[in-house]
Amino acid sequence: YHDYSYEICGRNGAIVFYKSNLLNKDTANWVILQYDTNLTQTRNTEIHIPNLAEPISSYYTDNFVHILFQKDDNRNKSSVWFLLTYQCDSVNTKLLPLALTLNEISYIKAYDDYLYCVANEKKTIGANVVHLPTMEVKGIYLEDYYIEQYAFLEIDTLNERLLIGALHFPKVHEALSTFALIDSDLGFNEYALKQYPESDGIWLTGARCAVSDSGDVLLVGTYNHNTEKRLSNLHTGVYALPYRNGKMGEI
């Protein structure tokens, strides 16, 4: 029995990857199968990966598939990370350790020379950016009194910036949920934290981000309108919120 994972690779078809067998107590053999767009197998690659490391997330861009592996370090109550980079149009495949500062990575995305890793840990939204040529790691952390939930990560390629969204859910129903937006350059060198102004009687419950060709941003999501601050009187709706030149619009 094998636990298969896959990644769609655009014009390069798709890859399927799985742990094939255990070489010794420290090392496992993994297989990567590449298929073209007609689902004909074109390559079979084997690579040795530390035993007990498991794939957490993968992302395809510009002929490369990046696969993030996590191995728990129970002694230090932390995680050890590895990045496998598979090149679809070449035999080049490599595995490198990553010095990430977060333990609960749930999503990765790659653009240009950067790999973005987003975590949703206890009460904290965090993200690491890896500069792939040097493997240097930087971090952004969004901490708040409220319990937070990661909403999106979008890249504005026109203006070379990164947008990370997080919902702030209240601990008690009397408090209104808000939304936080991290607006950063690609390398996390400079960033600003923006928040929705709290709207009377509205709880934000979802958010997605769309970036236009002109660089304008539209935030779209759902909300609950609470007329009497009772769960039985919640009415769901949809909002659209423009974000231009570092300023939020109004719901």
Regions found by a protein language model. Give the residues of each.
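Beta-propeller domains
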Residues: I15-I47
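A short beta-strand motif characteristic of beta-propeller blades
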Residues: Y1, Q41-I47, V91-L98, E136-D144, ...
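Well-ordered mid-protein domain cores that form the structural environment of catalytic cofactors
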Residues: T37, N44, I49-P50, S57-I108
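Long, internal scaffold/assembly segments composed of regular secondary structure
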Residues: F152-L167, K171-I251
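Asp-box/WD-like beta-propeller blade repeats and closely related beta-sheet repeat scaffolds
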Residues: S79-W81, D89-Y116, N120-G126, M135-L153
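Beta-propeller blade signature
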Residues: N29-T37, S79-S90, A127-T134, A175-F188, ...
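Repeated scaffold domains used in trafficking and secretory/extracellular systems
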Residues: Y1-E7, P50-Y60, L95-D112, Y146-D156, ...
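Short beta-strand elements that form the blades of beta-propeller/WD-repeat-like
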Residues: S5-K25, S57-S58, D62-R75, S106-E121, ...
